[in-house]
Amino acid sequence: METQLSVQLGLDSLLTDFGLESVMNKQQQLFANMGLSDIGAPTPSTAIPVPNAHLHPSMVAGSDPSNPVVGFGFGSPSSTTSSSPPLSNSPTIEQQQHAQLTAMMQGIMSNNNVAVSNGSGVQVASVPAVHCSGCKSNETATSFCQDCNANLCDNCTMAHKFMHCFADHRVVSLTTPGTGSSSSSTSSSSSASSTSSHQVPSLGGKQSPDSMMLGSGKRSVLCLQHRASELVFFCVSCNLAICRDCTVSDHPSGTHQYELIADVADKQMLKMEQLIADARSKHADMLDMFKQVDNKQQVLTASLHNAHAQLEETVSNLINVIQDQKKTLAKDIDNAFAAKQIQLTMVDKRIQSMADKLSQTIEFSRRLMSFASPAEVMVFKQLLDTRLQLFLGFNPDTSGVLMTPCEIEYLGAAGLFNNSASTVSQLLGSVHGGSPINNAPAANDFLMPQAGLAPIGRAQSRIIPIEQNQLARSPPHHIAGSLPMNAYSDSNLLRPNKDFGGSSQSLGPFNPLGASVPGAAADPFSSQYDKWSLGVEPSVGGLLEGGNVDEEKFQTLFPPSRSQIKRQKMIYHCKFGEFGVMEGQFTEPSGVAVNGQGDIVVADTNNHRIQVFDKEGRFKFQFGECGKRDGQLLYPNRVAVNRTTGDFVVTERSPTHQIQVYNQYGQFLRKFGANILQHPRGVCVDSKGRIIVVECKVMRVIIFDMFGNILQKFSCSRYLEFPNGVCTNDKNEILISDNRAHCIKVFSYEGQYLRQIGGEGVTNYPIGVGINSLGEVVVADNHNNFNLTVFSQDGTMIGALESRVKHAQCFDVALVDDGSVVLASKDYRLYLYRFLPATSGQSTSSASSQI
């Protein structure tokens, strides 16, 4: 395949060689399929000028499939009707014939028999005759106009010869078969000249491409500007091939340097080869860069998803921090309200008591003055004078409660909302797009509020300044002067010294980086709002407010932090349960107890039933169904067992808030307490069969007998914050776990507050309490891990354990006589942990192992 440059194609012809070669190969294959091999190919001695269309390939005689097409010229067509001269010579006649055959494929004639003749009048082949398409006469066509693409009759052919509108049209004559006559290919500008059978018709009277072949066999190339001149020079100054005429007109020797093409061709081609090699190298580099761009695009896309995920996580964590802080502030508001309410209640009681006494005295004096004799009046005069003088001098508001404002003022950080956008952006961090940003906050800036910036919702006075690298709990004297203790009054401060309960008082956030528990330092959100509390005696209240406390006295007020307690690891030896409504499945196992045979009793709240398992976790039986009738349960939340009779005692939360009693086989016995109880939270049965119920929200303890009669009830609102578990010992003492006070409160059956066991840093957020077979107090909490802390009856810590498996949230726990504890978790499973060696003795110190 050779390429001839032309004005029409230009440089694009170099870029389309392979496409045209493919076209020619397809045409050659098509010729073979259409039967040209049966007709025969034209010989080189026969020139066949054929029009562009309307001829079937089978009309050409002499086709030979063994004679392949060897080339095709892409310059000016080498035919007698060419309107422009060629730029180069054709090396072979086969290329000329192939071009003519290609022109034949543009149209197929049918229905008439005509023959195509060459310029010398030689009949090539007979074809069906066609009619004139240039006029309406419908006469037989005798010629074909390539420019009009129409078959012409004799009249139309004559018009093409003499009319100016058809000037320069290329007309090819057609002869009827059998006549043997022929007409030459004509042009309107000049009559067609016949040629010999071995010649190719001239192109417009100019030299044919075959005559332009050089003697050496090389092709000559004509100048694009001077069409008759051959390119023989190369202008080095202009980097352009020129002819002799160009050296005179456009490239004079004085200003342009040019040489013969034969002399500089090799050197210039070497330069071109070097440029091509450089281009190949550049192309390879561009391919590598394309791969790099693709890799960068993939990395960029991955980083986009990662950045969005991190942003969502940061926002979620920030929302959680705000929610936790909201709960803390809500608790502070409730504490402030409770303290103020208790102060007003005490003043109210004193006023009411004094008013009753004064009313009685006035009534007695009136009746004395009305019905007694003067002598009798004089007998009581001194007494009445003294009593009335005391009444007149009585001041019920000795603490000035009525003189101080009673409103609860929330000191929100209102100034932060003026620049809330910048504040939130600092908390959320910034975006790095691959280049360093000068104003990006440091990594540690996110862990602590900036100087002078209080946490959201906190007043500036409650910020506790600490050092950035202070990871341990700060000594008490560091914060004694900075905490306004009077901002968090507790009800215990208003009681006499003998009644003071010493419950933990929430003092708000400690230090942002004071991680006192393992893993807290790794969480920047939880560490910023780490809570600490302090059991305060009234005798030291003034010292705390004054801030003049030495370190030794102050350290005695702090319970040991969690990091100072070495807890032994324990693992569970049994696990059972899953989510569902079938046997052995739970939707909310919120209460658990153990009977005298070691069976595990579970209150499945949302399934409205009680399930009983053996100590290996195998299902035994169940009772209860949803409803309010006898034998039906509605949201049972706690369960206890009477060790003497084996009866089950079940408490229900709202809307029924009552107690139901079933025998050991699950048969209904009785129910009571619906009009008495409000928010039952914990229940146990002591050794004498008395039912002790502790209520949250109203902070009340009610003692029933097994038939529902009230034996005792008393309020614990001054001591409890959020009770969630209860048990008794053999000393007629009631032990109540307080989740928010982080300790165990001990009361007598008459409601007298006795003592506290545990405290924050030791029993954080307890979920239950019980007495084991050795008479020891076992406190369970769910802070970070599932923890067990063992105390003596007087509050001395004996041991501490923690689970190897982290339990996110737990409902309830119960003790087993073999030294195990049953844990009801919010993952719908029950776990059995063994924390004491197995003992054969039964519990003698408590009738309840309920935690």
Curated annotation (Swiss-Prot):
A zinc finger (B box-type) spans 127-174, 218-261. One of its GO terms (cellular component) is cytoplasm. It comes from the Eukaryota. The keyword ATP-binding does not apply. Disruption phenotype: No visible change in viability, fertility, development, body morphology or movement. However, animals are approximately 9% larger after hatching than wild-type counterparts. Mild defects in early embryonic cell development. No visible change in lifespan, however in contrast to wild-type, longevity is significantly reduced in response to dietary restriction. Furthermore, it suppresses the increased longevity and reduced nucleoli size of eat-2 (ad465), glp-1 (e2141), isp-1 (qm150), and daf-2 RNAi and let-363 RNAi longevity mutant models. One of its GO terms (biological process) is negative regulation of ribosome biogenesis. Residues 71-91, 176-211 are annotated as: Disordered. Residues 303-331 form a coiled coil. Zn(2+) 2 binds at residues 223, 226, 246, 251. Residues 76-91, 176-197 have a biased composition (Low complexity). Present in cells in which nucleoli are absent, and absent from large cells in which nucleoli are prominent. Highly expressed in the gonads. Translational repressor that inhibits protein synthesis. Represses the translation of mRNAs such as fib-1, probably by being recruited by RNA-binding protein nos-2 and the Pumilio proteins puf-5, puf-8 and puf-9 to the consensus core PUF binding motif in the 3'-UTR of fib-1 mRNA. Negatively regulates ribosomal RNA (rRNA) synthesis, ribosomal protein synthesis and nucleolus size. Its role in the negative regulation of nucleolus size is most likely through its negative regulation of the translation of proteins such as the rRNA 2'-O-methyltransferase fib-1, and dao-5. This is B-box type zinc finger protein ncl-1.
